Amino acid sequence: SVAGRAQGM
């Protein structure tokens, strides 16, 4: 999801 991309995972 977008939440993972916010941390760069």
Curated annotation (Swiss-Prot):
GO biological process: one example: defense response to Gram-positive bacterium
Cell compartment(s), UniProt: Secreted, Extracellular space
Keyword NAD: no
Domain of life of the source: Eukaryota
Keywords attached to this entry: Antimicrobial, Plant defense, Secreted
Subunit structure: Monomer.
Protein name: Antimicrobial peptide 1
UniProt source species: Cocos nucifera
